[in-house]
A protein has these predicted regions:
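Sequence termini and other peripheral, non-core segments
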Residues: 1-10, 22, 26-29, 115-118, ...
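Membrane-helix interface/capping segments
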Residues: 66-79
């Protein structure tokens, strides 16, 4: 008698993004109670941006495409409309650019010397890094690395 293969649970299928989200919530809670003028408080502010960037990267590369980037999954072959194909093939870059622009607007309207203004500035930096990594991996190679083709 063959054993029926069970599909993985929701927690198992999403354990990476859930773990990253839990780390981010933990850092947000600690930062909200810390003194941003101390080394430790400043560290937590930077860590929020870094871990948010990792979480966004994991989730965005799961749902969006970027043709030629080692950081993106491959689109299904059944998309035939040119505009739709362009939007789909570059949806990862488009999504990161649009959400990054929203972070920039928020940053420009915030007090950069405030506790959360510094965090938003770090998030803008992390967003630029993620977008840069997606674009760079379209054209640059690293032997032995998935990201470099």
């Amino acid at each position: 008698m063959r054993k029926r293969k069970q599909s993985p649970s929701f927690l198992r299928e999403h354990s990476l993004s859930l773990t990253l989200a839990a780390i981010l919530v933990f850092l947000l809670l600690i930062y909200s109670r810390s003194d941003p003028s101390t080394h430790l408080g400043s560290f937590f502010g930077n860590a929020i941006a870094d871990w948010l960037g990792v979480l966004v990267f994991v989730i965005a590369s799961k749902y969006f495409f970027e043709i030629g980037s080692g950081e993106s999954r491959k689109p299904a072959r059944h998309f035939h409309v040119r505009v739709a194909r362009l939007l789909i093939n570059h949806s990862l870059t488009i999504a990161l650019a649009l959400t990054g622009a929203a972070w920039v607007v928020l940053y420009l309207r915030s007090d950069v010397s405030s506790r959360w203004g510094q965090v938003v500035g770090n998030i803008v930096s992390a967003w630029a890094q993620v977008l840069g990594l997606v674009i760079i991996t379209k054209y640059a190679w690293e032997i032995g690395s998935k990201e470099g083709h």
